[in-house]
Regions:
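A residue-level marker of the well-folded mature domains of exported/periplasmic proteins
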Residues: 5-8, 20-356
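Short, Lys/Arg-rich N-terminal segment immediately upstream of the first membrane anchor
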Residues: 1-2
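Core hydrophobic alpha-helical transmembrane segments of single-pass membrane proteins
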Residues: 10-18
Length: 356
């Protein structure tokens, strides 16, 4: 009885917390078919409109709403403390699948999944320890970010004229170090003599939503001679694009976007973007659940790399003047080698590689 009262109290708090910031949204599907599943998406810091990670997840939900017979809703918690409340709210309302978008949902998903064994939960970028056994109703959606970062690193190494490139991370944590590790390896694969600068915006989740800090770090690296920067920092990276747009006439400043195609952020200054296909992972998971809401065979760890179309880089007509046919041919050869297993991309940065 006491446990039920505690869960009821938590649910009431969830309603109050989310209603207080007015962040509840719902989208019904106009497929003409009866709903086969109810699915919910809970965003992390930055929410919709971050032009990066969360927006990519939302594109996956949007596609599912267009193509699948599902009912879908999304929530934008007011702050990090509301993560558990938000996923608990959807679970208590009888949703078949609840997805937490971001690594910070790891503990919350594991906690709530125990209380709702009949609900499937998924977590994007979930932390899974080597010997950890996940609950049978939990899906960990993980990516080989280092593989996509390797390709944009190669693009940076081929495009740089100063032989100095930079990396800007959001929160200094193992996940973002994967981006840096792949980027460094890609740069060095095509430009062994290149110097790589590195900086992080902070050590807390707020480091992913500080464009002012991002601009400051970008200007510092441009000032030290870098002419190409890669950011893996959420909306903090918007400051890097601003720094590139402020380039004096005749000065070369290029930025590589992350998670989503960010070409539009600074046309003419965006070399490419490392596209982390959170939308693919979300859509594939929603599709599986729509076909059989109570299935459990999709639980466990699901990994998306180059071979699974989980990561990629942008190369099209908009940046053809920056990534020409010869450069693209070299990058595509590297892609084939990674998919075939001939190149093993590192996921950790060696201490000796870290530039001051």
């Amino acid at each position: 009885m006491r446990r039920r009262l505690l869960l009821l109290a938590a649910l009431l708090l969830a309603n109050l917390a989310i209603a207080a910031v007015g962040m509840l949204r719902a989208d019904d599907v106009g497929t003409g078919k009866a709903f086969t599943a109810k699915v919910g998406l809970v965003f992390d810091l930055g929410g919709r409109g971050d032009k990066s990670f969360n927006d990519s997840a939302y594109r996956g939900l949007e596609r599912a709403l267009r193509e699948l017979p599902i009912h879908g809703e999304y929530l934008e918690p007011g702050d990090g403390a509301d993560r558990e409340s938000a996923i608990r709210l959807l679970a208590a309302r009888g949703f078949d699948l609840v997805i937490g978008v971001g690594i910070m949902f790891t503990d919350d998903v594991l906690l709530v999944a125990r209380d709702y064994p009949d609900v499937l939960f998924a977590c994007v970028d979930m932390i899974v320890l080597p010997d950890q056994k996940l609950p049978p109703n939990v899906i960990a959606l993980k990516f080989r970010e280092e593989e996509g970062s390797y390709l944009v690193g190669a693009a940076a190494g081929l495009a740089t004229q100063s032989k100095t490139v930079g990396f800007i991370g959001g929160m200094d944590m193992p996940l973002i170090r994967k981006f840096e590790a792949g980027y460094r390896a890609g740069v060095k694969a095509v430009c062994p003599e290149c110097k790589i600068l590195s900086a992080y915006a902070g050590v807390t989740p707020e480091a992913f939503k500080d464009p002012v800090k991002g601009k400051e770090l970008a200007l510092a690296q441009f000032g030290r001679g870098a002419d190409v920067l890669y950011h893996a920092s959420g909306s903090t990276g918007l400051g890097a694009f601003e720094a590139a747009r402020l380039a004096p006439p005749g000065t070369r400043r290029l930025v590589i976007g992350v998670d989503s195609d960010q070409t539009h952020e600074a046309p003419g200054h965006v070399l490419s973007s490392m596209v982390k296909r959170v939308d693919v992972a979300v859509f594939d998971t929603l599709k599986a659940v729509s076909e059989q809401p109570h299935r459990r065979d999709i639980a466990g760890v699901r990994v998306f790399g180059l071979a699974q179309d989980g990561v990629d880089y942008v190369a099209d007509a908009r940046n053809a003047n920056l990534i020409d046919a010869k450069m693209r041919e070299r990058i595509e050869a590297l892609r084939r080698d990674i998919v075939a297993g001939r190149i093993q991309v590192p996921s950790q940065v060696a201490p000796a590689e870290v530039a001051p």
